[in-house]
Amino acid sequence: MTATPANSGSNPRKFSEKIALHNQKQAEETRAFDELMSDLTVSRVQFQKLQQLRLAQTRAQYYGGSLPNVNQISSSPNDFQPSFHPMDNIRGMRHHGLVERVSRNRLHSSHHRPVEKHGRQCDSSPYGSVYLSPPPDNNWRRTNSDSALHTSASSSKLQDAFMGGNQAMLRAPKPPQRNPSLQDGEMNNFGEAFSYPTSMTEENMLNVTKPLPKQIWEAQKVQCITSRPRSCEVPGIKVFPSSDSNASLSHYQGSLNTGGSLPDLTNLHFPSPLPTPLDPDDTVYANINAENSSGLPAAMTHLGISNSQGIQNTCSNPSIQATMNNNVNNHTPPGRNNPTLHPSLRLSSLSNPSLPTSALGSSPRRRHTPVSPLTLTPGSESNRSISNQFSPTSPMDMLPNSQGVSMDRCPLSLPPLEPPPPYPLYTDQPQPQLHHTQQQMHESPESQNFQPPSPVPCPPLDLNLANSSLSGFFGDSFFDQQQPTKQGKYLWQQQEQYDMFGSPSSSLPNTNAFFDPNMNLQYSQASLMGLGGSHGSLQDSFHLRPNYLYSNYGGSVPNIILTDDSSNSLSKDISNAVAGVSELGFDADNTFQFDDELKLGPLSLDGLSMLSDPDMVLPDPSIEDSFRSDKL
């Protein structure tokens, strides 16, 4: 009997079993504890998530980062309490994240701080309410994203659910009315809607009925559009909306809830700060169709010239472009002749409509617009079609108008869509026939084959430009009457070389020009190098000497070769141009003839001795002046 307890006490098997049982029990306790702690952790996390979701719904309108509403501060401490009540909710929710603030709109809260403290804080503020930023309304967001919209919609419903706590404290509600200036309105804790631009008086606080959170939400969705977008508000800037701000409501429709923080500017069309665009090629007017791609660029707008829809092509008159910038507003009366214009103004060509305007690609300052003289019509003259002034079946014996012709008989151009009729070939005639044709045209100025259009006023040109461009066009041998026959032969060689008209019936199809594209390309190059830029560039750029319609510039000699007597309009133009040149002082009889030395003929040795004799008394002092004028 005594051996058994000793054996049992010294048995290591039983001891190890006890240890195993102890470890098993400890492991079970540890497992139970871990399960309990995990359950607590899961429940705590779920509770925190639930609380955060609830707090997010109640605090959604303060997620914009706005400061507490201090615009409703007044002298009475009772007004301080509701104005700082949202700030206390924010502070309480930040420090006590798990504490649920359900009735945010109640007057008294368990975590509300004493009123006197807020009163002391606000009384010490050096700023008044007018210096503070406008309060954001309850639908103000940083963004208009879907999540923010969902939160704002849900928060408005929660706000309606918790309005029951204040109804006992509210005054008797008045009929529903909206403050017309309620654009930056704010719901305070009483449910009253305040308007920022108006003064915070007790009378204004009584003008709005109490249960209006949903009304403000739905009304301000439309009405706050008339003010600036919320993302454009600067806290330190106060904007007073005008009384007629609701008139522009339809202009901002569609700019709400576009999914971004920036305002929707798709409906706003801001005018260009520049009066004219930088590149005139981008603003060719819509009423100038593709047939005249040479068009009227925006430089015509600077000149004050209105373009007409009936103009199908324009005359390129490079020698008058510089003057048009100065004299386009000085219109001459209708029917007035301009006899002082020189023949270089006749040497114009039609712009080739098949060549784009970009072929004249120079800078806007340098390039001058090819302008038809007939586009200078003021008033209602420019708004009607001038291309109908021709009879479509009449023979086109007259080509585009020159500035030297009387403006009451000048047509614009050929019909735009028809190929030009046959034009008579140039014939080899000497230049003195010019005077013969002038006499015929002065005798019968009315014998014309085209219908005379209505009088069109034309701006007067500058005579200084006429002198400079005349010397640039004609050089030093145009009026040299010593070689008329040589000029005629040379011009005919020029005519055969360029061959502007292959046959009497030849013409370019679908164009309004009587010349080949190569000629127009040369003219475009001349325009690119500043043909009409300034007075001096007229002479410098004429090394190109492009082939014009009536002038093949082979050197300095113009190609003025007349046809038969039936070309009345052409001869009339040349006669008027030569008459204008004679008035300018370029008389063909005595200007360019080098016979100044022949004026010494009346003088003799006796006359020279009379001049050298100091004792000799002249009968008239004007005789000595006349000798001095002859450089003696």
From Swiss-Prot:
Compositional bias of kind Low complexity: 145-156, 339-360, 425-440
Region (Disordered): 105-156, 310-455
Positions of post-translational Phosphoserine modification: S66, S133, S145, S293, S372, S391, S556
InterPro entries linked to this entry: TORC (IPR024786), TORC_C (IPR024785), TORC_M (IPR024784), TORC_N (IPR024783)
UniProt subcellular location: Nucleus; Cytoplasm
Compositionally biased region (Polar residues): 310-338, 372-405
MF terms in GO: cAMP response element binding protein binding; transcription coactivator activity
Main location: nucleus
Function: Transcriptional coactivator for creb1 which activates transcription through both consensus and variant cAMP response element (CRE) sites. Acts as a coactivator, in the SIK/TORC signaling pathway, being active when dephosphorylated and acts independently of creb1 'Ser-119' phosphorylation. Enhances the interaction of creb1 with taf4. Regulates the expression of specific CREB-activated genes such as the steroidogenic gene, StAR. Potent coactivator of ppargc1a and inducer of mitochondrial biogenesis in muscle cells.
Gene: crtc3
Protein name (database record): CREB-regulated transcription coactivator 3
Basic residues bias locations: 105-115
Assigned GO CC terms: cytoplasm; nucleus
Protein family per UniProt: Belongs to the TORC family.
Biological process according to GO: cellular response to cAMP; negative regulation of adenylate cyclase-activating adrenergic receptor signaling pathway; positive regulation of transcription by RNA polymerase II; protein homotetramerization
Assembly and interaction partners: Binding, as a tetramer, through its N-terminal region, with the bZIP domain of creb1 enhances recruitment of taf4 to the promoter. 'Arg-300' in the bZIP domain of creb1 is essential for this interaction.
Keyword annotations from UniProtKB, A to Z: Activator, Cytoplasm, Nucleus, Phosphoprotein, Transcription, Transcription regulation
Top-level taxonomic group: Eukaryota
Compositional bias segments (type: Pro residues): 413-424
Residues annotated with Phosphothreonine modification: T151
